Amino acid sequence: MKKILYCMFIGALLSGESNAQTNNSWMELLSADKNHIATRTYTQETGVAWQDKIDYYDGLGRLEQSVLRYSHNNNNNMVMYQEYDPQGRTSREWLPVIFPNNGGKFILPDVVKTKATATYGDNAPYSRPVYEASPLDRMLEQYGPGQDW
């Protein structure tokens, strides 16, 4: 009797797990080796248009890259990348760039930086904060994108 109950319990668990996987089939295409949170926001009541946002995090739980996918945008993805200094503070926020047909996957930082530099025609397509030299880490200045700053 115990074996029958055990088999029924395992069967119920496995059927629930397979059900959860089929409902989120669009998420199976994401980068499995990176920590991420994926959200889908419907932009029309009929459910035919949506926006997917995938936030990828580094090993310390800091936001590293955000990818926006739109259902009506020819499969183009807008990618935003963020860098940190050795103290864990934001050091550079790169301007967003478009990558076609990526499916929301994580893109290597060097590829994002190269594309941003080429897209904007500037050697510094990122904003950059300057922090005070104290344990409080207060921001003193904020430089905008572009080498002119």
Enumerate the predicted regions with their spans.
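Acidic, low-complexity segments
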Residues: 4, 18-149
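Bacterial N-terminal signal peptides
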Residues: 7-15
